[in-house]
């Protein structure tokens, strides 16, 4: 195959498509190669016998990244992708009794948690949200700043981030300090399964996974 494009991208998954969109907006000629018969990669949808199936994820998490990419090319991610916010995000039904409707209405979450397992856990949820807002903000600054060498790993910036990320703790041990009730620990930790990890082994950084759902919502 002969191509006269300035850039050749292999794979029409989310990363390849995002690169192509940004490059094309900048005036670069781009060609994308894809082995499948459609775009999307792991997020592709395919049809069989009149039904549509998700090739991978069944919902959309943390829209801010897509919003930034689409805004950079003068588009609206929610409009062009047809994102549908879910409310509630999902319902959790506990084997030990009780349920929660996970929602971005944080005060409603506090009220539900208080009814389910008391004020101590409700206050723990407030602390969890504030803690992870800080964790997310410092993580973003850290990831958006160049790391030029080994000395950066022991810089004031790195130590400040490490203090908040607490890499010496697991997700499970971090949550146990905020939620005495095991149902709440489960509600805020099962998201590590998205990454194929156990909350007992996943670094505490990944407490942000549930936080992103409560702060930014879940979309279909």
Enumerate the predicted regions with their spans:
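N-terminal glycine-rich phosphate/pyrophosphate-binding loop and immediately adjacent elements
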Residues: 3-137
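Active-site-adjacent bridging/hinge elements
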Residues: 35-36, 204-207
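A short glycine/serine-rich beta->alpha loop
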Residues: 48-52, 195-196, 217-220
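A short mid-domain helix/strand-loop element embedded in enzyme catalytic domains
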Residues: 69, 202-205
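Generic alpha-helical structural context detector
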Residues: 71, 189, 207-210
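Short, intrinsically disordered/low-complexity patches at protein termini
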Residues: 77-78, 146-149, 208-211
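Rossmann-like flavin
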Residues: 95-203
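Helical element adjacent to the flavin cofactor pocket in flavoenzyme catalytic cores
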Residues: 208-220
């Amino acid at each position: 195959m002969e191509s006269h494009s300035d850039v050749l991208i292999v794979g029409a998954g989310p990363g390849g498509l995002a690169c192509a969109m940004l490059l094309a907006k900048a005036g670069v000629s781009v060609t994308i190669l894809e082995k499948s018969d459609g775009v999307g990669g792991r997020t592709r949808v395919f049809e069989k016998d009149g039904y549509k199936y998700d090739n991978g994820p069944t919902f959309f998490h943390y829209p801010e990244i897509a919003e930034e990419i689409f805004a950079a090319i003068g588009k609206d991610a929610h409009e062009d992708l047809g994102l549908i916010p879910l409310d509630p995000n999902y319902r959790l039904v506990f084997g030990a009794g009780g349920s929660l409707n996970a929602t971005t209405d944080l005060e409603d979450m506090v009220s539900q948690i208080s009814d389910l397992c008391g004020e101590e856990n409700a206050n723990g949820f407030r602390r969890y949200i504030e803690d992870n807002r800080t964790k997310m903000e410092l993580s973003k600054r850290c990831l958006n700043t160049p790391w030029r060498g080994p000395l950066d790993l022991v810089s004031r910036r790195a130590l400040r981030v490490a203090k908040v990320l607490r890499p010496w703790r697991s997700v499970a041990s971090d949550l146990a300090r905020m939620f005495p009730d095991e149902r709440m620990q489960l509600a805020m930790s099962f998201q590590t399964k998205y990454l194929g990890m156990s909350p007992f082994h996943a670094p505490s950084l990944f407490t942000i996974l549930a936080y992103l759902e409560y702060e930014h919502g879940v979309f279909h």
